[in-house]
UniProtKB/Swiss-Prot annotation:
Required for maturation of urease via the functional incorporation of the urease nickel metallocenter. Belongs to the UreF family. UreD, UreF and UreG form a complex that acts as a GTP-hydrolysis-dependent molecular chaperone, activating the urease apoprotein by helping to assemble the nickel containing metallocenter of UreC. The UreE protein probably delivers the nickel. It comes from Haemophilus influenzae (strain 86-028NP). This is Urease accessory protein UreF. It is found in: Cytoplasm. The gene is ureF. Keywords: Chaperone, Cytoplasm, Nickel insertion.
Amino acid sequence: MAQTLNRSLTDLGALLHLVDPTLPIGGFNHSNGLETFVQQRVVESKATLEEYVQTQLLQNWIYNDGAYLSLAFDAMCEGNFDRLCELDWQLSATKVARESREGSFKLGVRLLKIFIRYETHTLLTAYQQAIAEKRVQGYFPIVFAMVAQAMGLSKADTLYAFYYNAAVGAITNGVKLIPLSQMDGQDILFDLRGSLVQAVELSFDPDEEWLGAATLANDIRAMQHEVLYTRLYMS
């Protein structure tokens, strides 16, 4: 009983560390196009921010970052390094907005730099070497999956944590940009609980035919962000 409890708490601690908002990777610097939506007054209220995050969650992330994370987790379980590299290349091709693409691999490289100090795993070492040799970029969802699997976390918990982290980031940025009250942000996060579970279910075994399915409005805003006159975020 005590051994099972200790293992469960250890896993929980590892998961909380992985999604810690104070990790020094620079995630708070990126809005991934949300800043453009706000400046264009498409997202301008509590209701429109919730709709934005809901759309990202169930029409974008489950076919893009979440799906790649899911497949990378499977590749880690199989010890398939070539597959991890292939997913990195595919993700690079499907992230069409330059700022979002560059932001993702910068976050991934920094995340790996932190956790490779604590997790001894041959695939993490090989992947870091591949990044150094510029054979892969090191995208955030792929590194997130690799680190979580190396920690011994479950795939469902990893997906939920990833989506939760992404949703919190979008809500926090929206609250700051619009602006809204902190309580509005908490209400949105509470309302998304069911959608977070749904996202995990939909991307647990992703259909590879849907990988990279485009959300055109978001991709366009992410590109337009490069030329905004004033901006708070890097993407």
